[in-house]
Amino acid sequence: MSLKMMERLSTDMDGTRDVASPPARQDAAEPERTVELSGVKEGAAPNSPPRAVPVIELLRRGEGLGNIKAREQELRLQNIRTTELCRATLTPATELCRAPLTPTTELCRAPLTPTTELCRAPLTPTTELCRPPLTPAAEFCRASLTPASELCRAPSSVTGPSLTATTELCRPPIPLPTPSTGPPAEQAVEARMVQLSPTASLPLQAAGRTMLYGLNQPLASDNSGYFGDPDTFPMYTSNSRAKRRPGPIEVEISEGPQPKVVRRIFTNSRERWRQQNVNGAFAELRKLIPTHPPDKKLSKNEILRLAMKYINFLAKLLDDQEEEGNQRNKGNKDNGMVQQELLQDMLSPNSSCGSSLDGAPSPDSYSEEHDALDSKHSRNLHQAMLPIDGSGQR
């Protein structure tokens, strides 16, 4: 009877029973037997699963079929408690998701590459913020844009439109004729190599040149007082203002946003040439003033003062010469009239009985009187020149 019950229990519990441990000794104490029934040994961990008791041991202890089935159900419940929350095996990195995930994708269930932690679509390293993939060469050759529109541009390939040279920030880029033949990369390089040159700049207009200098008015002429014959005096001519000669360097001005700079350059150049003309006129005037050392250094103030004194002296000298000529003519007329009267008196029949030449003056007396007049005039002229000589020796 006992053998049949053992065979029936063994066929019912083939899939669920564990490997039996060696049987305990029958002469063990009663506390040991109660511990074996509960499946926990002394010193074992409290959370460790209880050891399975073999069916033969249960039959030996005299337990019935109902007790064996209850024991079996208890073992199944204990095995279910050992699995924590998920039935599938999970890796330590995927503690919140039941599907197996790679360690780099802790927040998303779809497998992603390590470089794309925020976006699921695969991106290249150059497109960091979810842009369409671009090649490294297309990062600088996109489209002809101004320097202000450097951000937020649409992607373009290398074979796009050639770039224009943005060499001038004040004006829009100038369209340059590019040859139709040749690869597009060479055309882009040629357009990038454009420098600031007269051919690349805007054409010069006549208004810019006339703003600095007159086109038909030189700053000086060949027949001016400074460059002309020293015998002529330009200050007495009708055109007293000296003409200007052209400067050594003419600055060509194109259209630009700097009118103040252009006006300052023009003013400085005009003042420089005016000062040169004034200095040249003073140098010519200094040559005309007689001084005791001929090469004496004089300031502009001294040159002007000596020139005024010299002009006054020359004017007075001309007046004296004119007065002297008038006196000579008057004296000659008076002497002729006196001689005629004397001759008439001498030749007249009513003359005195004495000698005819007693009362008539001799020719020597007329020469002595003329010499006295000449000496008096020379003394007056010498006195007029004395102040000029004293001032010239300073």
Swiss-Prot record:
Domain of life: Eukaryota
Annotated tissue distribution: First expressed in patches on the ventral side of the embryo in a region that will give rise to hematopoietic tissue. By late neurula stages, expressed throughout the ventral blood island region. By tailbud stages, expression extends to probable vascular progenitor cells, but is excluded from the presumptive liver anlage. Also expressed in the central nervous system at the tailbud stage.
Compositionally biased intervals (Basic and acidic residues): 1-17, 367-377
Entry GO MF terms: DNA-binding transcription factor activity; DNA-binding transcription factor activity, RNA polymerase II-specific; protein dimerization activity; RNA polymerase II cis-regulatory region sequence-specific DNA binding
Compartment list: Nucleus
Assigned GO CC terms: nucleus
Induction: By bmp-signaling in the ventral mesoderm. Inhibition by fgf regulates the timing of hematopoiesis.
Region (Disordered): 1-49, 347-394
Keywords, comma-separated and alphabetical: Developmental protein, Differentiation, DNA-binding, Nucleus, Repeat, Transcription, Transcription regulation
GO annotation, biological process: erythrocyte differentiation; hemopoiesis; regulation of transcription by RNA polymerase II
CDD domains assigned: bHLH_TS_TAL1 (cd19706)
Record domain bHLH: where: 262-314
Chain segments carrying region 7 X 7 AA approximate repeats of [TS]-E-L-C-R-[AP]-P: 83-173
Annotated Sequence repeat ranges: 83-89, 94-100, 105-111, 116-122, 127-133, 149-155, 167-173
Pfam families named among the record's database cross-references: HLH (PF00010)
Function: Transcription factor that acts synergistically with lmo2 and gata1 to specify embryonic dorsal mesoderm to a hematopoietic fate.
Protein name: T-cell acute lymphocytic leukemia protein 1
Organism the protein comes from: Xenopus laevis
Gene symbol of the encoding locus: tal1
